[in-house]
Amino acid sequence: MKNLGNLMKQAQQMQSKMAEMQATMAEMEVTGSSGAGMLQVTLNGKYELKKVKIDPSLVDPSDVEVLEDLILAAFNDAKAKAEAAMAEEMAKMTGGLNLPPGFKLPF
């Protein structure tokens, strides 16, 4: 019975740490770029777009498709950086515990 009590206490501690990490990660900002840094997007830890910077030389009304592709590439770059930062924080919190592929925690 004592082991069950310890297990419950550990689960509560882990839940508390998860809540702290979620709050920290939500405030984190990452910037992705494309076009040699001429286009940048900034996301927060919830993948919400916070900022877009476009070098004026990229704006060509006759070739909007290039600008669209650069925005998409910059967004995907920022998203990958956010995911990597979250994975790193998760590894710190779980002590390097290898979670199964596709296992997602509630955030």
Curated annotation (Swiss-Prot):
The keyword Protease does not apply. The keyword Protein biosynthesis does not apply. It is found in: Cytoplasm, Nucleoid. InterPro entries: YbaB-like_sf, YbaB/EbfC. Gene3D superfamilies: Nucleoid-associated protein YbaB-like domain. GO terms for cellular component: bacterial nucleoid; cytosol. GO terms for molecular function: DNA binding. It holds the Pfam family YbaB_DNA_bd. Keywords: Cytoplasm, DNA-binding. Its main location: cytoplasm. Homodimer. Binds to DNA and alters its conformation. May be involved in regulation of gene expression, nucleoid organization and DNA protection. Belongs to the YbaB/EbfC family. This is Nucleoid-associated protein amb4104. It comes from Paramagnetospirillum magneticum (strain ATCC 700264 / AMB-1).
